[in-house]
Structure formats: structure tokens, C-alpha cells
Amino acid sequence: MRRTGQLSRPRLRLCATGHTGSLDTESRGLHSELVMELLAGNVLPDDAGLRAFDALSSYVGVRTSLVAARLHDLPSAKDTESLSHPRAGGGAVRTQALPYANSEAGRHPRFHEIIAALLPLLLGGELLLWVVLVPVGLRGQADFAMFYTAGYMVRIGQSGQLYNYDVETRYQNQLVSKTPAPYTHLPYEALLFAPISFLSYRVAYWLFLLVNVGFAIFAVLLISPAGSGWPSAVILASFFPVSAAIADGQDSIMLLTIACAAWLLFSKKQESLAGGLLALGLFRFQIVLPIVGLMFLWKRWRFLAGFAPCAALVLVFSGWLAGFDQLRVYGSHVLSLGAVAGQETGYSLSTSQSQRMVSLRALFTNILPNGHLAQIITLLASIALLIWVASRGRILDRKHQFALAVAFSVLVSYHLFVYDLAILLIPMVAALELTGHAQSRAAQAAILIPLLAAPVGILWRPFLLALPLLAFLFVITCAFRTHSEQVGEELVEERSYAALDGVPS
């Protein structure tokens, strides 16, 4: 490149000021002109200016890699293998590694080392969890008992009595155990368990456990970013809520698989299909509806157009299966779960249950002396978070919007236990993909927070998990926004570079 001009230190300082956002309109115009001249190769800095630019680089980072390449007469950030090669035409080139010129510089191998170091401890805790929960499940004292009983009732034509506590308890005592576990999900889900009700309870428990393991593996295979197979597998194997859901015979892994498939479709711009698929997860409406609410605020109309008719079909089918009057009964049961001491037999939320929940509602219910005050504070906090997440997530791409909506949904969920946190694998895997980019510390922290907080919450006071979940939401929002801003600025640079070289962007 022929040196056609000199860019002095004062002008580079002006360039630096422009990146801090403190220039007036006239100066911003001059700054933009300088950047374009640098990209075009019409001006090059003198030695003093080059030193000033190097000082600037520590702040600018990856955002001006193309400018840096032109200043140093080097290849762009997309081709960094020749950074230490001699300058064409003679003369040695500066070989100081630019933090933004090499994507590997943004990688943090120590993060994988941290995960590997924590793995024995986490897997040891997982093993203990399985040793405790599997015998409980085999004795009929796990939540799988309610699914098995509900499936049996649908199979023998008693679906109209699914929410009759006395009838359900009688069947459960005959088939499983005398530990009451009332069915609290929509009727359509009970139909899924009708086939395995032909088997004995213990055999059905083992079969569903294996099915859940298969669903979990399939879910991770769906969403794992390229080249990160083993970290995704490690997170799956060491994330306590996943094991808790499988060992307890819960349907949270089914929801995880549905949500992962919906996330994949949504990321590929198939929003209608994603919305329709997510509607099948309405058996966990307390998680699905907050996601849908954010999609409404983000004006994802195609997603809503797919969700609405499928959700209506789910409700109509449930009404046909169990009777539409049973949907009203189901609604009253759900409202009964909303009180610390509900009025309906078998469906009240006991104090011990509220202490085992993990959402904001559980946190305020347990730390505030008045139940009504806790509900008001929960509502206000949830609305405030909804507004904040909606505004912060508006600029994100589809993939990160959906993942952020999932992180938000578990925090404001109406009724949520530790095993329901399995769906957090979606934002955790999304954060895992960002650990290979520059400025990825927030993404790394976002992965570690639920990974480490979940086992502590299980062993101590689960309702306090709302605090690290809140931190998780803030940190992962920061990680997603930082990535979005970097991608946006790099895209502007690439288009400017392509335009200057006469290549369509």
C-alpha cells in the first residue's frame, strides 16, 4: 500500500474520542470521514499516530479490526495467519498481536478447565441424587405416580374424573402407593401416559426414565453449537435439574425437548412452526406463557400466529377428552395452587411446598410475613422484569431472544420447582456458544451460575434459588447484548470494506 498521506496523533485522538461517543455532530462527521479514509487506504498514520492507535486498540477491541488491518497494512481479522509475515515489498511489519485481530485471543481455555475441574464434584452430587431419588420413585412416592394414575384413568374411560381428588386418590392407592399426588396438568397430557399404564408401575417408571434420558440427549443434540459437543454434554450430565426431573419421573424433559425444537425453528426464521410447536408444551403453561408474552412485546406476529391456533386446539382437545366442565375445575385447582393455604382438598400449596419452589413468587412468599403482600410484590416485580427484559431484548437476534425469554420465564413462573429448571439448558447452551468470542466473561458466568447454584438450592433452601436466577437473567442479558452490539458493528465494518473494494455486501 502506498503511503498517500499522514494521519497525525491529534487526529487519532479525535478518532479515539469518537469511539467513546463524546463527539458533537460535526466531530462525528469528521471521525466517520477518517475511518472511511483509513479503510480506503488513502491515509496512513505516522509513527506517533500509530502508537496512539495502538493505545486506542485496548478500548476499541474487535470492533475496528478492519481499520487496524488497514493501518498496519495487514490482512483483516478473517485472515490472521499472516500477521507475522514480512510486509510485501520489503520491510518488517509490526508483529504485536492485536487483541481484536485474532478471534482466538478472545477465547478462554481456562473456562473449559474450570468446567473440567468442577465435573467430578458435580457428577458426585448427581450420583448421590440418583441414589436417593430412584428408590423413592420406585416406591411410588415420586411425581411420576400422578402421570401413571392419570394415564390409567384415561385408558379405562375415567378421564372425566381426573380432577376429582377422592376418585384419583382411590386409583392411586390401588395402583401405586398411598402417597397422594393429585394430577395438576391439562387433560391432553394424560393421554400420553395411557399406553404405559398397561405395565406395572415399577416397569412403567423405568421405561419413562429411559424415555426421558433419550429426550434429554436428543434435546442437546438439537441445540448444541458446532464444535462444542463435549461441553454441551458435560452441562447436560452435570446440571442437577435435569437429573432431578428424570429421576422424579417429571415431564420437564418433554418440555425441554419441545422448547429446544421450537428454539431451533425460531432461530431459522420458521416462527410460525416454532409457535405451534411450543403450544404443545402448555402442560407447563406457567413456563410457556411468559415466553409468549415476550414474543408479543417483541412483535413476533408470525410466532403468535402459529401459537394461537395450536393452543386453541390443545384446549379444545382437552375439553373433548375430559369434558369442558373439567377445564373449569382445572382452573379452580390452579387458582388454589396460588395461595399458601388453598381451600381445595389436595390442591392447596403447603408451606413446605412453597419452600421447595424456586421462582420470585416462592422467594417473596417465604421472606414476607403476609401472603397477600407477597402476591402484590411478586406481581409488581414480575411486571418490572417483563418491561426490562422486553426493552433489553428488542435488539437481539432470534436465537438470543428466545433464550432470553426462557431465562425470564422460569423466574416469573407461577408454579415452579427445581426440576423445571431443566429448560435453562437453552440459555446456557446459547451462552456456551458465546464463550468462543471476545469479551465472553459474562457468558461464562451465565453458565456457571445455574450450574453451581442448583445443587446448593436442592440441599438447602430451594426458594432462595430465585436470587441466583435473577443474577443469571441480568448476566445473560448483558452477554447477549454485548454479542449483538459486536456483531452489528462488525457487520457495518464488513459492508464498508466491501463497498470500498467494490464487492457487494
Region locations from a protein language model:
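Non-catalytic N-terminal targeting/anchoring module and adjacent flexible stem/linker
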Residues: 73, 86, 90-92, 100, ...
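Hydrophobic alpha-helical transmembrane segments of integral membrane proteins
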Residues: 116-117, 191, 237-238, 281, ...
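Membrane-interface alpha helices of multi-pass inner-membrane proteins
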Residues: 272-285, 289-296, 405-412, 448-455
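Membrane-embedded alpha-helical segments of transport systems
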Residues: 283-286, 313-317, 442-445
